[in-house]
Curated annotation (Swiss-Prot):
Domain Ig-like C2-type, first and last residues per copy: 42-102, 137-200
Name of this chain's protein: Killer cell immunoglobulin-like receptor 2DL5B
Annotated Pfam families: ig (PF00047)
Function: Receptor on natural killer (NK) cells for HLA-C alleles. Inhibits the activity of NK cells thus preventing cell lysis.
Family: Belongs to the immunoglobulin superfamily.
Database matches in InterPro entries: Ig-like_dom_sf, Ig-like_fold, Ig-like_Receptors_ImmuneReg, Ig_sub, Immunoglobulin_dom
Extracellular side: 22-238
Stored Gene3D superfamilies: Immunoglobulins
Compositionally biased intervals (Polar residues): 355-366
Length: 375
């Protein structure tokens, strides 16, 4: 039984630990950007650092790229506004949390957050093959190209945070391009693309002109597209977190009620064991009462008064014979006590004299009923 309890507790702990890890961990905060981590040059972005452990003081630092003096170990309360951004702001950021009562103790670092600064190079061009309007189920390919020798292209869809990227490949017409296959089209959307260099991966060009992809035979032209595996993966990940947390909570509830049931059972067993000796004593007392006979002592009192009687004739005698009155008195029950030999002898003597007295009394009564001879 104890092994099952330990197993349930371990399963719940690891499930809950896995769920917490996806959201930033047990003792580290979660860092995010609003409205987006892709910021145009000269724009502003708000960095939010949140924690489940009640941290109210946060420290922000940059891991790579050019250091930003005003952000070096910056202390802030939950959020900080960064901007106007420059190429120096591009890079990877983390934050730490602390309590006001212990400002020198900091939590583990948060998840990494990449800030991308755009508008540093000329914009590329974006096109769709076979065209921007396709039928449902038809394969679509988006091509991002530029005459500049960029190393990487990034495809962005409106309303989606993750941007897939592909390396640039020289084409026959002297341009550098990357082809993004979307697969069978089911939904449309608005797309743009960016270009970047290897030595500055977080400094992007201006966005291309937006391209609207329409899918005929579907009423929702701006819904999710076939290039949404990342968003679906995010949904599955959050669903996994929700399921894991729910299972852990259910296991802890079951464990709580199981321990409560065991505690109540132990208390009931202890109460029954405490009552058993008292019950045995009651039964023994009743058995002793049943074994001891209820002794009742009767004392017969003779009310015959030996007085001088007058002999009368039989005709004057009462027709109803005299009735001897006997009175009984029940004495309280008492356990018989052992008598000493002297007491036993005295009791036997009293019984003998009592029998003699009773016999003498009966003889006298009988003689009083004998008819007298006529004179």
């Amino acid at each position: 039984m104890s092994l099952m309890v330990v197993s349930m507790a371990c399963v719940g702990f690891f499930l809950l630990q896995g769920a917490w890890t996806h959201e930033g961990g047990q003792d580290k905060p979660l860092l995010s950007a609003w409205p987006s981590a892709v910021v145009p040059r000269g724009g502003h972005v708000t960095l939010l650092c949140r924690s489940r452990l009640g941290f109210t003081i946060f420290s922000l630092y940059k891991e790579d790229g050019v250091p930003v003096p005003e952000l070096y170990n910056k202390i802030f309360w939950k959020s900080i506004l960064m901007g106007p951004v420059t190429p120096a702001h591009a890079g990877t950021y983390r934050c730490r949390g602390s309590h006001p009562r212990s400002p020198i103790e900091w939590s583990a670092p948060s998840n990494p957050l990449v800030i991308v600064v755009t508008g540093l190079f000329g914009k590329p061009s974006l096109s769709a093959q076979p065209g921007p309007t396709v039928r449902t189920g038809e394969n679509v390919t988006l091509s991002c190209s530029s005459r500049s020798s960029f190393d990487m292209y990034h495809l962005s869809r409106e309303g989606r945070a993750h941007e897939p990227r592909l390396p640039a490949v020289p084409s026959v017409d002297g341009t550098f391009q990357a082809d993004f296959p979307l697969g069978p089209a089911t939904h449309g959307g608005t797309y743009t693309c960016f270009s970047s260099l290897h030595d500055s991966p977080y400094e992007w060009s201006d966005p291309s002109d937006p391209l609207l992809v329409s899918v005929t035979g579907n009423s929702s032209s701006s819904s999710s597209s076939p290039t949404e595996p990342s968003s679906k993966t995010g949904i599955r990940r959050h669903l996994h977190i929700l399921i894991g947390t729910s299972v852990a909570i259910i296991l802890f509830i079951i464990l709580f009620f199981f321990l409560l049931h065991c505690c109540c059972s132990n208390k009931k067993n202890a109460a029954v064991m405490d009552q058993e000796p008292a019950g045995d004593r009651t039964v023994n007392r009743e058995d002793s009462d049943d074994q001891d006979p209820q002794e009742v002592t009767y004392a017969q009192l003779d009310h015959c008064v030996f007085t001088q009687t007058k002999i009368t004739s039989p005709s004057q005698r009462p027709k109803t014979p005299p009735t001897d009155t006997t009175m009984y008195m029940e004495l309280p029950n008492a356990k018989p006590r052992s008598l000493s030999p002297a007491h036993k002898h005295h009791s036997q003597a009293l019984r003998g004299s009592s029998r003699e007295t009773t016999a003498l009394s009966q003889n006298r009564v009988a003689s009083s009923h004998v008819p007298a001879a006529g004179i």
